[in-house]
Amino acid sequence: MVPVEDLVYRYALLNAVKHRGRANPGAVMGAVMSNEPELRKMAPQVKEAVEAAVERVNSLSPEEQQQEMERLGLEITERKQKKRKGLRELAGVKGEVVLRFAPNPSGPLHIGHARAAILNHEYARKYDGRLILRIEDTDPRRVDPEAYDMIPADLEWLGVEWDETVIQSDRMETYYEYTEKLIERGGAYVCTCRPEEFRELKNRGEACHCRSLGFRENLQRWREMFEMKEGSAVVRVKTDLNHPNPAIRDWVSMRIVEAEHPRTGTRYRVYPMMNFSVAVDDHLLGVTHVLRGKDHLANREKQEYLYRHLGWEPPEFIHYGRLKMDDVALSTSGAREGILRGEYSGWDDPRLGTLRAIARRGIRPEAIRKLMVEIGVKIADSTMSWKKIYGLNRSILEEEARRYFFAADPVKLEVVGLPGPVRVERPLHPDHPEIGNRVLELRGEVYLPGDDLGEGPLRLIDAVNVIYSGGELRYHSEGIEEARELGASMIHWVPAESALEAEVIMPDASRVRGVIEADASELEVDDVVQLERFGFARLDSAGPGMVFYYAHK
């Protein structure tokens, strides 16, 4: 096996050669996590190796990077215009395709974000294009400082690779520059009207007195805004005052916010609204296609006014329907409040719809990706169910998850009359005998799952037949034929002498306590196993006292 450092170095080298000699740590980490699933459990170590590899590769000249490529036998595979099943073609492709995933850093990503992230990534791969991660943090009151690290980490888990990271709070001077250009072109004005007064005029389709002021006076007002109080002035983009949608009439592009920003402190007081910063960035960053929900249709109209004022060609806009999902908390603000109240244990509480909560339960990113590609970019609304996610995830886990006996709410019993010890070997995976076997030794006392324990004949799977009656477990016979004649119910079991304590955290955060067979001690954190006749679960803590998070049946 190639050492992690060497493997990561190759990914960094490929990324650098593909992108003008500069490797991006986020893109390299995403590529490693996506293509080398066995390394996911080593994410912290891999991240350190990635950072070191990127620094090493970026210190090389383009010629030296090419020499390294030849030495290692690496090649850039051309994938231009390669069709990928499940996604329709993009309209208006004229050259390099550039897309962006642009979350607000109010918290970690949830499964709703996964759709936009995956679709943009899939299209970037489909057309051998570029994907920009743009952190839209121009509302200082809605920024969670931890989100700057959580968002890239969530994308890495999802297997999304990006080529460039842009943080909008680093671009404030750019927004100021284009605000001035817009005012000079007569496309915007500074409005000092009281909000309720302007609303009445807007609803009647009438202009306020600020709209008719010349650009010189508006430029003076603009410069004075930096000393004004919050709420005393805004910049408005001129649109059609008779537009059928009042929300589009002379929309606000800049406003005063007297709040400290987690990254820039009190350096700035005038911040762009989303529609302004998004349109400016999409143009300046060369974004060719914008994928987003149909709830942004009105925003598209707003931004098109800005494009016309500045003489810019708008990107191709592709809108898709809403994604509905029942029985999951997707509200970031609601989740934060619940965490602060102690209702949730954190962003990875199993009741939440965050990607880190889903990952903690053992749901694989490949299952989420497959679902999002299946849903695609259709304009009709879609309903996403846990049942569908579980089905896709099960098809992945069935092939790789090791099997173990787990007795939930266990009852400890002695097998009365057992003639002698019974040694049982069962495969760790029924379809992959090469993985090896696990060994259970029945010596007398066993744990049986409380919910499955009923009076009558039972067969301890692969071991012996017993009769359970009046709280006593009595040996009957050993063969499977006798079990069939008895009509015995199959029941899994854990030898009492070697049992390990374990508990499973369920999706509703309830806890199921039990015991697991001794061979499970070989498991490592992040391993996903099948607890036979109970369900798939991910090992979250190795002990003492193993803790699993339940995925699904």
Swiss-Prot record:
It comes from the Archaea. Its EC number is 6.1.1.17. It catalyses: tRNA(Glu) + L-glutamate + ATP = L-glutamyl-tRNA(Glu) + AMP + diphosphate. The keyword Aminoacyl-tRNA synthetase applies. Transmembrane segments: none annotated. It is an enzyme of class 6 (ligase). Coiled coil: none annotated. It is found in: Cytoplasm. GO terms for biological process: amide biosynthetic process; glutamyl-tRNA aminoacylation. Keywords: Aminoacyl-tRNA synthetase, ATP-binding, Cytoplasm, Ligase, Nucleotide-binding, Protein biosynthesis. GO terms for cellular component: cytosol; protein-containing complex. The keyword rRNA processing does not apply. Pfam families: tRNA-synt_1c, tRNA-synt_1c_C, tRNA-synt_1c_C2. GO terms for molecular function: ATP binding; glutamate-tRNA ligase activity. HAMAP family: Glu_tRNA_synth_type2. PANTHER family: GLUTAMATE--TRNA LIGASE, GLUTAMINE-TRNA LIGASE. Belongs to the class-I aminoacyl-tRNA synthetase family. Glutamate--tRNA ligase type 2 subfamily. Catalyzes the attachment of glutamate to tRNA(Glu) in a two-step reaction: glutamate is first activated by ATP to form Glu-AMP and then transferred to the acceptor end of tRNA(Glu). This is Glutamate--tRNA ligase. It comes from Methanothermobacter thermautotrophicus (strain ATCC 29096 / DSM 1053 / JCM 10044 / NBRC 100330 / Delta H) (Methanobacterium thermoautotrophicum). The gene is gltX.
